[in-house]
């Protein structure tokens, strides 16, 4: 049945190619429906209690991750024209669609005459630099907003913008940020744009940039290698058309089902260009081999080739897909989508390869011999040396592996949220500037909650004895996160005391505090929930690793144990949830490696039904993974989600070469008199195709080193390293193990 289908494809290449073209055109129509976005929520685990707590916090207090910090550095810090520009910008920013509120050096002047900079546009304005310096120093020392809008040395100033909830999507955020840049572009200060909202918007820009940056060099590498190996334009064009068609089909399917491109799935087209081309190369290489070796007509050679290779590359595509499908065992939606989409893309590449490549070759009658055995000198040396000294090729890689594996126990999973950016990146430097002068950009929330029971019938969270505990909590945060900025009822009341001229020791009663809170209005930062049983300390903190934050959580827990039993403390916010998710995701991805290994082992066991062959295959494919893990530990590199994800993915890809080698070895055993001859024949026949496909994979993954994202950079580096190491093992360790391990030779 299958042979008849392939016969129809080969005999009717025009119909086959037109069918592929028609389906490609239809799916292309759905690509414009794809949307590009990045949200912190994409990284949240679906089953994490901390996520539920965060969304509960958002329901009570609103979003805390919709802040933009615009920093300015003036040329002349005290020139009146500078302040005229800043005041105009302040009013313009307040009018922007999507901006809920703006805080600046002009905000405090409406409440406190000592912070009023004067009538900047009046004809009789008396501008005195010393007076301005005094006023700016007064503004900077305000407990509530001073350190957020002016640096301590007055060198930098800032506007703090809070976006409306409806503007919390990529399209509206981009429009707001574009308008902000337009308003500030032709003014005298230099400007820096920072904050989580800017981070999200710029991330999307980096995604688009990376795709445009990756594809040209990858295409050049593919075309160059295919041209060198096959020396035939048809054999160059067909693999390129295969991966291009695969990408279009997958993007069309994503658009059809309403999927979006996010911080992980943006790399899917690039990966399919790298991974999806190997099937076409194996088909073309085997067709050349059959045409050259046997007395087949081109049609017979193609039919034999497609019958042989359709099954082989289906199995190798299945093992590659398993590596990606294993990622779906995590509870992070974007990781699940990434695994599903790449797995589907790999199988699409298989389908396109077994239809488009044979049809194209038959249509254009590309039956020339081309270049044979591109890597024959290396393969000849291996086929001659390995049978003579198999134990050398076993002991050396095992020794290197055990040396590296010894350090695996010291691997760290410590990470921070800004680890995604490379240190030389402009956005990274902008965030660091904000950290240095304005306390950071990462949202951190601490809640002091009052339990509703008989002990608290007559209590409210603004009782003096409860505010004392809130003050202790805020003092601890200021001590442990000394470069960060926090805001609560306590800092608000300190600011009120300063404006009123009250002593710092004065305590306000509940009625007065209620009046202060009511006067702030709904558009201001909410410091107490509607039920009035929770107080909020909101902060923008500097970048911290998960281990550093764990120490802070421990100190907060220790302090909270000294509070009355009816008070509890919770830490939440996107920073808290994202760091906890990072630790969970690393563990989950390590588990996915185990899942991939189990399923791949089952496939190998079913195919070969030989314990020795299965053992040889597992050793060959696990050594690169554990060796790289050990090297990471030696180099002091932490295991993070992108590095953890690499291992199950690379395992799925690396097993392909082992399968090709072992399937050919099994075939050669039936045709040769002993295993030495079978190993030599296998290395010479399969080795060239393996080296071609691995060279393409390693070169393609190496292009990812150009990415602005450190996770993509690490994913590319580790994948290239593991796949390259896997090839070395497949061409040295695997044949050596096949020679020394006992197994039937028929």
Residue ranges, per PLM feature:
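Hydrophobic transmembrane alpha-helices and their membrane-interface caps
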Residues: 235-283, 613-662, 702, 729-733, ...
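Interfacial segments of transmembrane alpha-helices in multi-pass membrane proteins
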Residues: 11, 205-261, 329-333, 591-637, ...
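Signature of alpha-helical transmembrane segments and their immediate interfacial
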Residues: 1-38, 354, 359, 363, ...
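Hydrophobic alpha-helical segments
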Residues: 250-367, 706-707
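Pore- and gate-forming transmembrane helices of large, multi-pass membrane proteins
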Residues: 240, 279, 293-330, 618, ...
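Hydrophobic, glycine/alanine-rich multi-pass transmembrane helices and their short helix-loop junctions
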Residues: 225, 314-357, 361-362, 601-604, ...
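Extracytoplasmic
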Residues: 55, 61, 84, 126-233, ...
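Juxtamembrane segments of multi-pass membrane proteins
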Residues: 390-393, 397-516
């Amino acid at each position: 049945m299958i042979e008849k289908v392939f016969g129809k494809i080969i005999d009717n290449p025009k119909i086959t190619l037109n069918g592929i073209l028609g389906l490609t055109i239809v799916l292309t129509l759905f690509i414009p429906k794809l949307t590009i976005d990045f949200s912190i929520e994409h990284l949240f685990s679906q089953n994490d209690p901390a996520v539920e707590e965060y969304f509960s916090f958002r329901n009570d207090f609103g979003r805390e991750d919709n802040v933009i910090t615009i920093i300015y550095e003036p040329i002349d810090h005290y020139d009146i024209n500078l302040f005229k520009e800043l005041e105009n910008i302040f009013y313009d920013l307040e009018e922007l669609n999507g901006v809920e509120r703006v805080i600046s050096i002009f905000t405090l002047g409406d409440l406190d005459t000592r912070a009023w900079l004067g009538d900047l546009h009046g004809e009789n304005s008396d501008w005195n630099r010393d007076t301005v310096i005094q006023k700016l120093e007064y503004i900077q020392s305000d407990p509530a907003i001073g350190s957020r809008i002016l640096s301590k040395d007055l060198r930098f100033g800032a506007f703090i913008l809070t976006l409306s909830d409806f503007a919390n999507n990529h399209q509206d955020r981009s429009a707001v940020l574009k308008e902000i840049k337009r308003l500030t572009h032709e003014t005298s200060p230099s400007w820096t744009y920072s904050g989580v909202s800017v981070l999200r918007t710029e991330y999307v820009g980096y995604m688009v940039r990376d795709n445009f940056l990756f594809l040209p060099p990858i295409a050049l590498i593919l075309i160059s290698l295919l041209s060198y190996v096959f020396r035939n334009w048809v054999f160059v064009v067909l693999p390129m058309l295969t991966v291009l068609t695969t990408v279009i089909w997958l993007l069309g399917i994503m658009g059809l089902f309403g999927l979006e491109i996010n911080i992980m799935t943006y790399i899917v087209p690039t990966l399919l260009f790298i991974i999806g081309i190997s099937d076409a190369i194996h088909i073309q290489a085997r067709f050349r081999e059959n045409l050259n070796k046997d007395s087949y007509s081109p049609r017979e050679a193609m039919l034999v080739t497609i019958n042989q290779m359709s099954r082989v590359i289906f199995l190798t595509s299945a093992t590659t897909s398993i590596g990606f499908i294993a990622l779906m065992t995590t509870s992070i939606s974007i990781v699940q989508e990434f695994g599903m989409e790449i797995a589907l893309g790999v199988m699409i590449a298989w389908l396109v390869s077994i239809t488009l490549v044979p049809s194209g070759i038959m249509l254009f009658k590309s039956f020339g011999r081309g270049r044979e055995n591109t890597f024959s000198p290396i393969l000849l040396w291996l086929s001659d040396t390995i049978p003579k000294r198999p134990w050398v090729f076993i002991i050396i890689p095992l020794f290197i592996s055990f040396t590296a594996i010894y350090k695996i126990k010291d691997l760290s999973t410590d990470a921070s949220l800004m680890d995604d950016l490379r240190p030389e990146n402009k956005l990274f430097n902008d965030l660091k500037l904000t950290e240095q002068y304005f306390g950071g950009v990462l949202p951190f929330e601490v809640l002091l909650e009052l339990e509703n029971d008989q002990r608290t019938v007559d209590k409210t969270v603004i009782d003096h004895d409860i505010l004392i505990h809130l003050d202790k909590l805020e003092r601890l945060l200021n001590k442990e996160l000394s470069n960060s900025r926090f805001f609560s009822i306590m800092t608000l009341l300190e600011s009120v005391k300063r404006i009123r001229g009250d002593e710092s020791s004065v305590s306000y009663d509940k009625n007065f505090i209620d009046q202060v809170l009511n006067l702030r209005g709904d558009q201001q930062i909410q410091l107490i929930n509607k039920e009035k049983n929770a107080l909020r300390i909101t902060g923008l903190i500097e970048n911290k690793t998960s281990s550093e934050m764990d120490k802070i959580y421990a100190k907060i827990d220790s302090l909270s144990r000294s509070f009355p039993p009816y008070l509890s403390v919770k830490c939440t916010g996107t920073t808290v949830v994202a760091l906890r998710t990072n630790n969970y995701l690393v563990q989950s991805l390590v588990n996915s490696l185990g899942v991939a290994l189990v399923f791949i082992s089952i496939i190998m066991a079913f195919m070969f039904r030989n314990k020795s062959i299965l053992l040889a295959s597992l050793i060959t494919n696990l050594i690169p993974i554990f060796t790289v893990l050990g090297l990471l530990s030696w180099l002091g590199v932490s295991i993070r989600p992108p590095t953890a994800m690499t291992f199950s993915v690379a395992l799925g890809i690396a097993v392909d070469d082992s399968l090709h080698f072992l399937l050919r070895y099994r075939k050669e055993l039936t045709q040769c008199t002993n295993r030495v001859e079978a190993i030599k024949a296998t290395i010479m026949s399969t080795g060239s195709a393996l080296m071609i496909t691995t060279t393409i994979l390693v070169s393609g993954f190496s292009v990812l080193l150009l990415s602005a994202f450190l996770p993509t950079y690490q994913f590319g580096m580790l994948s290239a390293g593991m796949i390259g190491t896997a090839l070395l093992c497949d061409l040295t360790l695997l044949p050596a193990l096949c020679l020394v391990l006992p197994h039937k030779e028929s």
